[in-house]
Structure formats: C-alpha cells, structure tokens
A protein has these predicted regions:
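N-terminal auxiliary segments of SAM/dcSAM-dependent transferases
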Residues: 1-19
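Short alpha-helical patches at coil-to-helix transitions and adjacent helical residues
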Residues: 47, 51-54, 79
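Conserved alpha-helix/loop element of class I SAM-dependent methyltransferases that forms part
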Residues: 53-63
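S-adenosylmethionine/decaboxylated-SAM
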Residues: 15-39, 45, 62, 67-251
Length: 251
C-alpha cells in the first residue's frame, strides 16, 4: 500500500468506476503478447492525454540541441516515453540523452515554503525496493528495440537532487540541455534545478513545471518566482494537460 495520497481531481464516482477497469485489466482474456500491443484498451483518456502532452513538448525541442532532464521520475514512465519519442521523432539523433533524477525512496524532507499534506510529506512517492534496477532493465530493452542501440542514450541518477545534481553538472560541463521537466513539487529541489541547469540551456530550450500556480504545492512556484527566470522566458500552458506550464527560454 502507498504511504501517501496521490494528487488528482478524481471524483468519488470516477474512483468507483476505475475499480471496474482494474478488474477488467486483471481478468483480461488477452494473451500477454497481445496485452502489450493493445494497451489502449485499458488507457483512460486522462492518462492518454499525458502521452499527447509529452509529444507536444518533445516536438518543441526537435531543432534544439541538448539532453533531456526529468526531475522526479517516480516509476519512470516519462523517461521511457521521452526515450521512445526520441526514437520516433529523431531516430538518428544519437547526441540527445534522456536523464532521469529521483531518490527512488520518496521525498527526503520538506522546507518551510512547502505545504505538508497527505501527498507532500517525507517518504511520499517512494518506489518498490531496488526499483531503479527494474527501470534500468526497461530502458535497456527499449534502447535495444530502437535504432542505433549500440550508443547509450539514457541515464538514471539516484539520490537527493540537492547533492546529486551539482555533482552531475560538475561531471558534465560539456552538456547542453534542451528540455527540463520539473515534477518535484518542492521548493528546495526546484531551486537547485534552476540554479544548476540554467547555465546549460540554449535559446529555445524548454522548462516544464508540473505543479506551477498550485496552492497545494507552492514550492515550485515560489522557487521559480524568486529565480527571476520568468523575466527571460515565454510562458504558456499545455494544450493537453492544462495544469502543466511550459517555459520557453529566451536567453
């Protein structure tokens, strides 16, 4: 059982209806190999919109050089999907790597600028024991399934961003970043991401916030406003997920 309440706007009726979907999925008559190519049968429209959203932001960076950084990977779906979108939109671009950052043990702590709740608390969004190994294996599989599989185009960075990100940037001074996806909800890691990653952006790079302008999760917005980054970016919202905010860096 999870030790937190995932943030969503789901009604009680929707929650009840989803129990039916879970049963249909668990009791599916489809063979496993057919399940894997017919996942749309069990994909809700709200979940499908996330796929369209990731395609939306990826298409904004196709002509922008640099890697993709995902902060707050959790189970890693965004990392896998962005990795496969690279294979779809630019299969021969071996220079673009998808890098995922997470503790894989949940939030280490919160600052006074964050709002503690059943969703935001120490240990929330933890994964199963050794889950990073499973995610690594999944990414290895997708790498081998796609073109130019002999060149590694993904990386997972485990640990607290406050420590791992400065070390990563020091080790990768050559790096440009085309897309930053911030899904950490908290003040301190958001501040660290902005401070460490901005020097690696180029004009046209994209910064995506998952919980901007959200009263329940003030940390991301406070860190962004304090940084002054809003003065150097064009701001828009996603066409598919209205609570996702897209910043286009103008340098």
């Amino acid at each position: 059982m999870s030790n937190y309440t995932p943030h969503n706007k789901t009604s009680d009726n929707q929650k009840s209806n989803r129990e039916k979907l879970y049963s249909l999925y668990n009791e599916s008559p489809l063979p496993l190999e057919e399940m894997l190519i017919n996942t749309g049968l069990y994909t809700r429209s709200s979940a499908l919109s996330k796929f369209f959203f990731l395609g939306e932001i990826y298409q904004k960076i196709i002509n922008i050089p640099g890697n993709i950084h995902v902060f707050g990977t959790w189970w890693g779906q965004d990392v896998v999907l962005l990795h496969n979108l690279r294979a779809i939109f630019e299969p021969y671009n071996f220079t673009r790597k998808v890098v995922g950052f997470d503790t894989f043990t949940g939030y280490p702590d919160l600052s006074e600028k964050d709002t503690v709740s059943d969703t935001l608390k120490e240990g929330a969004y933890t994964t199963s024991a050794n889950y990073i190994d499973h995610l690594q294996a999944l990414l290895d599989y997708h790498e081998k399934e796609n073109i130019m599989s002999h060149i590694n185009k993904f990386e997972l960075v485990e640990g607290d961003i406050l420590r791992t990100l400065p070390a990563y940037c020091e080790k990768n001074k050559h790096e440009l970043i085309s897309l930053i996806y911030i899904d950490v909800a908290l003040y301190d890691p958001t501040k660290a991401i902005i401070e460490n990653c901005i020097p690696h952006l180029v004009k046209g790079s994209i910064i995506v916030f998952d919980e901007l302008n959200a009263k329940e999760y003030p940390g991301e917005t406070i860190a962004l406003k304090e940084s002054g980054l809003l003065n150097t970016c064009t701001v828009e919202r996603s066409k598919f997920l209205p609570d996702r905010t897209i910043l286009v860096y103008n340098g």
